[in-house]
Every structure is written in structure tokens, then in C-alpha cells.
């Protein structure tokens, strides 16, 4: 990669976070933050073998928004370096059917997938002075569907927040990469039927790394990525589907 400074993965056990860590770790310290430090030993060993100068794990609960600033400060202290790449990869899919009747579950989805993301992105944009922040929107937020409107609404809100944050960071030396992937075939969606233009965590990570590399420099540019690229055309077609038909669309 050639990037200097520390790499922070918030959501260290996530499929996409792990793939990005593998591609961005060479020659730099890495901090893997997740809810509990278990389950990351294998990735830690792999990153060290791939050229990371050090790999630290950090317990982090996204729902504890009051701890977010302290988590970032602790990550920088563990790495012994300024954080120059931060990947916000935590999140939950939740259970749509349950959320329709259980307000606490609906709130949990909104908290982790929207409010906690806004909090963490705000802290990162305030603390970091250069480099890249990576956030994950989704095709699910492009137009809410009956089948997943709770999760989709969080992604719609997050996407809007990221567009504004990207404009705020323009010319600052810090850039925001907002990924809008389609259905991601991974551990979070295990057992679900893939949608058209589905992608794997590996494909998402490749696209994000390419965007980071293309925007490197003293004035990196923020970018929004449709992954895969043909998904952008499908997204615009989705906007044209009449609502009586749209409300019956599957996830």
C-alpha cells in the first residue's frame, strides 16, 4: 500500500474488515477492535505474517457511544502511531420480522447501524488529521423495502450523513471512502438467498483499496463507490419501480 501510520479496523471480526486488514497491513501497526477480544488470534497471526509491524486487539462495544473517543485514543496509544486509515466495519443485520414487533430490537439495529456509526465517524473526523476513513453504506438504503426497512433505513441515514461529512472533509487532508455494496455473501448473510449483483467481502475490499490508492496524496479525495459498478444502474432503475410493485419486492 505504501501508507504510513496505523491501521484501525473497528469490527475486527467482520468479513470485510478482515479482508481490508490483509490488504492494508504491510509495513504498519494494526489495531483490531471488536466486541470482546476473542476470535481474532488467527487474523492477528496472518497480519503479522503479511508484514504488519505489530497487531493489537482492543475490546470495543459500538453501542457504548460514550466510549468512542476513548477507544480511538487507546487504539493510537497501542499502535504507538497516528491513525491514518480507519475502517468502520461493525454492524448488525438484525431480524426484520422481530423488529416489527419488538421495539427494543428495532432500536438496537438503529443504534448499532446508524447512531453508533455517526458517533464513531464524528470522532474519527475530529481526531484524525490525514489519511482515509472507510464507511459502509448499502444498496439496502437506496430505497426502503418492506422486507428489510429497519436495516435499510439505517443505511439510508448513514449514507446521507457520509455525503455531508465527505463534503466537510474536502481539501482537509482527510478523505472519506463510502462503500455502497450490493448483497454481500458472507457470515452476516449466511443462509440467505443472494440478490442480483451480489458480491463477496473480497470483492468489496479490493474496490475500497483501489479507491484509497487512487486518492492518496496530501489532498486525498473522498469517494462514493458502487460495488460492483453496474449496481449504480440497477439502483436508478429501482427508483422507477411503482410503489405497489416495490412493496412486494424481496430483500
Each model region followed by its residue ranges:
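Residue(s) in the substrate-gating loop at a strand-loop-helix junction
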Residues: 138
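Catalytic Tyr-X3-Lys loop
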Residues: 102-119, 158
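Conserved mid-core segment of classical short-chain dehydrogenase/reductases
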Residues: 73, 85, 91-107, 147
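Conserved glycine-rich cofactor-binding loop
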Residues: 13-14
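Conserved glycine-rich Rossmann-like NAD(P)H-binding loop of the short-chain dehydrogenase/reductase
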Residues: 27-43
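C-terminal helical subdomain
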Residues: 178, 193-236
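Active-site helix of classical SDR
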Residues: 121, 154
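Rossmann-fold cofactor-recognition segment
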Residues: 47-66
Amino acid at each position: 500500500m505504501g501508507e504510513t501510520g496505523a491501521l484501525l479496523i473497528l469490527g475486527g471480526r467482520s468479513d470485510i474488515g478482515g479482508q481490508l486488514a490483509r490488504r492494508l497491513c504491510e509495513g504498519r501497526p494494526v489495531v483490531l477492535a471488536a466486541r470482546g477480544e476473542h476470535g481474532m488470534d488467527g487474523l492477528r497471526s496472518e497480519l503479522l505474517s503479511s508484514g504488519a509491524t505489530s497487531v493489537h486487539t482492543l475490546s470495543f462495544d459500538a453501542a457504548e457511544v460514550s466510549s468512542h473517543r476513548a477507544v480511538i485514543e487507546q487504539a493510537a496509544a497501542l499502535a504507538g502511531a497516528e491513525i491514518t486509515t480507519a475502517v468502520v466495519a461493525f454492524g448488525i443485520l438484525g431480524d426484520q420480522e422481530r423488529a416489527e414487533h419488538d421495539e427494543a430490537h428495532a432500536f438496537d439495529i438503529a443504534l448499532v447501524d446508524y447512531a453508533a456509526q455517526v458517533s464513531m465517524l464524528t470522532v474519527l473526523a475530529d481526531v484524525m488529521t490525514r489519511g482515509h476513513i472507510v464507511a459502509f453504506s448499502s444498496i439496502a438504503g437506496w430505497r426502503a423495502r418492506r422486507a428489510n426497512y429497519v436495516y435499510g433505513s439505517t443505511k439510508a441515514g448513514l449514507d446521507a450523513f457520509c455525503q455531508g461529512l465527505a463534503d466537510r472533509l474536502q481539501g482537509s487532508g482527510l478523505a472519506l471512502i463510502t462503500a455502497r455494496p450490493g448483497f454481500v455473501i458472507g457470515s452476516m448473510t449466511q443462509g440467505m438467498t443472494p440478490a442480483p449483483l451480489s458480491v463477496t467481502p473480497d470483492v468489496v475490499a479490493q474496490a475500497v483499496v483501489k479507491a484509497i490508492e487512487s486518492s492518496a496524496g496530501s489532498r486525498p479525495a473522498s469517494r462514493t463507490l458502487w460495488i460492483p459498478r453496474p449496481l449504480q444502474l440497477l439502483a436508478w432503475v429501482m427508483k422507477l419501480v411503482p410503489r405497489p410493485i416495490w412493496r412486494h419486492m424481496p430483500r
